[in-house]
C-alpha cells in the first residue's frame, strides 16, 4: 500500500512520510504525511522482497539499485526465490508523531482513548517498522513442528532473547 502511495506521489513530484502503520486482522491502517517535494534518498525506500519458499531466507533490494539475488541458505540449487514488490522498505512509523500523540494532554484525560489504543501507540513507538522482513506465526509453528502458533508474547520474548528484533 505504501509503495503504491509513494509511486503516485512521486509521479506528482511529491514525497511521503509514513506516520504510523498497523493491521487489525485483515485490515491495514496507514497514516501518511504528503510532502511538497521528495526528500533526499526517499527513492531508496522502495524495493523488492525476495523470500525462499524452502528455507525461508529473506532478502531486500532497493528498486533503484537492483542486482542479482544472492544465494539463500538452502543446499546448492535447492531453494527458489519468490519476489514481491515493489514495496515500501523504509520506516513505517514516525517516532516524533507517535511521541506527540502519546504526550498530548487531551489524550491523558480519563476515557479520552481506550487502553487498547494506548497499548497500540506504545507498540508502534517501540517498533521502527524495519527491516522489511516478516515471519507469520503460523508458518513458524509449521516449521518448528508445534501444534499451533505460539503465544505472541512468548514468541517476541524468545526472539529478542536470541538477539533479533521482534515487536
Cite the ranges covered by each PLM segment.
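SAM-dependent transferase fold signal centered on methyltransferase-like domains
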Residues: 1-167
Amino acid at each position: 500500500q505504501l509503495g503504491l502511495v509513494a509511486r503516485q506521489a512521486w509521479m506528482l513530484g511529491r514525497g511521503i512520510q509514513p506516520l504510523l502503520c498497523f493491521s487489525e486482522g485483515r485490515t491495514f491502517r496507514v497514516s501518511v504525511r504528503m510532502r511538497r517535494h521528495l526528500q533526499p534518498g526517499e527513492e531508496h525506500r522502495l524495493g523488492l522482497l525476495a523470500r525462499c519458499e524452502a528455507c525461508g531466507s529473506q532478502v531486500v533490494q532497493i528498486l533503484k539499485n537492483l542486482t542479482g539475488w544472492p544465494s539463500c541458505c538452502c543446499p546448492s540449487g535447492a531453494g527458489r526465490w519468490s519476489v514481491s514488490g515493489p514495496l515500501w522498505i523504509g520506516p513505517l512509523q514516525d517516532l516524533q508523531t507517535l511521541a506527540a500523540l502519546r504526550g498530548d494532554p487531551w489524550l491523558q484525560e480519563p476515557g479520552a482513548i481506550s487502553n487498547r489504543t494506548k497499548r497500540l501507540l506504545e507498540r508502534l513507538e517501540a517498533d521502527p517498522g524495519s527491516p522489511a522482513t516478516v515471519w507469520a506465526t503460523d508458518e513458524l509453528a509449521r516449521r518448528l513442528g508445534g501444534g499451533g502458533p505460539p503465544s505472541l508474547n512468548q514468541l517476541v520474548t524468545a526472539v529478542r532473547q536470541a538477539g533479533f528484533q521482534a515487536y
